[in-house]
Amino acid sequence: MRTSQYLLSTLKETPADAEVISHQLMLRAGMIRKLASGLYTWLPTGLRVLKKVENIVREEMNNAGAIEVSMPVVQPAELWQESGRWEQYGPELLRFVDRGDRAFVLGPTHEEVITDLIRNELSSYKQLPLNFYQIQTKFRDEVRPRFGVMRSREFLMKDAYSFHTTQESLQQTYDAMYEAYSKIFTRMGLDFRPVQADTGSIGGSASHEFQVLAQSGEDDIVFSDTSDFAANIELAEAVAPLTPRAAATQEMTLVDTPNAKTIAELVEQFNLPIEKTVKTLLVKAAEGSEFPLVALLVRGDHELNEVKAEKLAQVASPLTFATEAEIRAAVNAGPGSLGPVNMPVPVVIDRSVAAMSDFAAGANIDGKHYFGINWDRDVATPQVADIRNVVAGDPSPDGQGTLLIKRGIEVGHIFQLGTKYSDALKASVQGEDGRNQVLTMGCYGIGVTRVVAAAIEQNHDERGIVWPDAIAPFQVAILPMNMHKSFRVQELAEKLYAELRAKGIDVLMDDRKERPGVMFADMELIGIPHTVVIGDRNLDNDEIEYKYRRDGEKKMIKTGDILDYLVANVKR
């Protein structure tokens, strides 16, 4: 490709509304342009990267035995009503009616559609297992689209769905997808980790996320420092304290705390160790419960894990925090003064809270706290559960080492769905014994557009993007200095350009009448891994300058060797 025949829409300034580095660089490098909130046009440079990501995904899915299909973006509401997700999914599901007053949705995912297809196409266990995938546009009406294509409303996704008659067969395909995903992200040159994860709104049992490590990541991922344990913080078990609860040394006293409405204020004003405080959060109780609310208690320096809390039988799903009015109606005190003593609604405490003694908590009286609370003396020990986020330094749940926490960007997710959708949509085949058998399913997703942003978050410097070779928009940039004035520069540039293309290498030749500084800045901003600079001065010595974008290393290479050097060093 020649820049004179290409749309090279680079920007010098960073757009003010771009929050994260990937969004900033995708705009500056001319990869995307915003059309509306959460909607982006992909320009040629961005589309080249997107297609390379897509091709790697497609190759590895095909290698793993998956079969490509294409399903409609628009889906009839009846399928979502049949599965039960019409009510469950929430406002992210864009719903509309056509001119015939029939209800439809814009698909955020395709479990219902593929299950409907399979229940009508398959009849015997002999046709299974099968694994279908597509790479297709999805739409989720995000309440607050942000971070460019990292959290957009319209996005490209690879979604796959497998069907089985046994759990063993599902496990084999799940393992094959785990391996395929590992190959996909390795080929893309990404530093990633597969981690145990929650199944979320998709449903099912076993689940793994593939997380690209990056400081800007939205997820906290947890690792053991000595074993292979890795999990999303939502799922990581907080191991119960190993030391027994200390004996009481204080009497419980009622203390006036009119200006201490938060744990931080309580600690500061009364010089308390934060690990000796307890915070109480009230959430709505499950439907049909005797009480309207449930009190959840965690240590003052810990955070409630909402995913764990939502799984408690007495807690409403989705987890909903009580309003101040609801709290006052149930407890007769405000949110800043809540605690376990005389709490009139059911209480669940975290394991770490159960191990505390002589602790401080709200007195369920406005402006007052109890200090020196002890379990089984001042208040009976209530239900104990793991309801907090782990913190760095906690013991690893596998009993090996301690936990580290890093930020990650989720780019892939695999699920063992079981029979959630096949039960709801009555998808079955005739089993080996002649009886009807409900199908077992797996679901496997990759956020193709998200991968592009995640790769940039992990691969950039002060000058721009630093693409891994496999997904770079171009692998080689040719920068001929003053080619319009020098015949030999032009001749050699054209020759090298043709030879690289003949070798199947993606090459961009900058044939603009631009200053060298502009040419260098654009190529570094775009992030092309390999750059060759052809100039009269170096040609006097029969040499060409080569620069590797990732480490900035420059070297002089003989003109007769440059083609072989590039062919040997470009990773494909």
Swiss-Prot record:
Molecular function via GO: aminoacyl-tRNA deacylase activity; ATP binding; proline-tRNA ligase activity
Main location: cytoplasm
EC id: 6.1.1.15
Catalytic reaction annotation: tRNA(Pro) + L-proline + ATP = L-prolyl-tRNA(Pro) + AMP + diphosphate
Record-level GO BP terms: prolyl-tRNA aminoacylation
Keyword ATP-binding: yes
Enzyme class: ligase
Domain of life: Bacteria
Alphabetized PROSITE patterns for the sequence: AA_TRNA_LIGASE_II (PS50862)
InterPro entries per the UniProt record, alphabetical: aa-tRNA-synt_IIb, aa-tRNA-synth_II, aa-tRNA-synth_II/BPL/LPL, Anticodon-bd, Anticodon-bd_dom_sf, Pro-tRNA-ligase_IIa, Pro-tRNA-synth_IIa_bac-type, Pro-tRNA-Synthase_IIa_type1
Key words, A-Z: Aminoacyl-tRNA synthetase, ATP-binding, Cytoplasm, Ligase, Nucleotide-binding, Protein biosynthesis
Pfam annotation, one family: HGTP_anticodon
Any one annotated GO CC term: cytosol
Compartments it resides in: Cytoplasm
Keyword Transcription regulation annotated: no
Family statement drawn from the similarity comment of this UniProt entry: Belongs to the class-II aminoacyl-tRNA synthetase family. ProS type 1 subfamily.
Domains (record comment): Consists of three domains: the N-terminal catalytic domain, the editing domain and the C-terminal anticodon-binding domain.
Summary of the function given for this chain in its UniProt record: Catalyzes the attachment of proline to tRNA(Pro) in a two-step reaction: proline is first activated by ATP to form Pro-AMP and then transferred to the acceptor end of tRNA(Pro). As ProRS can inadvertently accommodate and process non-cognate amino acids such as alanine and cysteine, to avoid such errors it has two additional distinct editing activities against alanine. One activity is designated as 'pretransfer' editing and involves the tRNA(Pro)-independent hydrolysis of activated Ala-AMP.
Subunit structure comment from the entry: Homodimer.
PANTHER family reported in the protein's UniProt record: MITOCHONDRIAL RIBOSOME PROTEIN L39/PROLYL-TRNA LIGASE FAMILY MEMBER, PROLINE--TRNA LIGASE
The name this protein goes by in its record: Proline--tRNA ligase
Gene name of the encoded protein: proS
